[in-house]
Amino acid sequence: MIIKFNFEYRGFYIEGMPLDQAENGHPEDGITYTSYVYFSKQEYNDLEDYIFDLCESYDSPEELKENTPKNIDKYIKKHKLKR
């Protein structure tokens, strides 16, 4: 069974969504995990759009959980956000 997961980092809300690539016609790629990052859990609950620049696909949930916070830090620095 494939389970999605979510966590928070520096006020951002991250949803990790598994996708079986066989459904996209690429069974050789197995299952990938995509990060959907929102400015807050409230924005996620309000069905706001995710931050497109932080949407990435990874080969494992561990890779997503390790790299997404790094990408968020870069995003904060690039956009000079106060977090």
For the regions a protein language model found, what residue spans apply to each?
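Surface-exposed beta-strand edges and flanking loops
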Residues: 5, 16-18, 37-41, 76, ...
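Mixed-charge, Lys/Arg-enriched low-complexity segments
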Residues: 43-83
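Hydrophobic beta-strand residues in large extracellular and virion-surface proteins
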Residues: 7, 14, 33-39, 60, ...
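Weak global preference for isoleucine
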Residues: 2-3, 14, 31, 51, ...
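Negatively charged, low-complexity tracts enriched in Asp/Glu with abundant Ser/Thr
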Residues: 1-23
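Short aromatic-glycine-(Arg/Gly/Cys) micro-motifs in beta-strand/loop hairpins
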Residues: 27-51
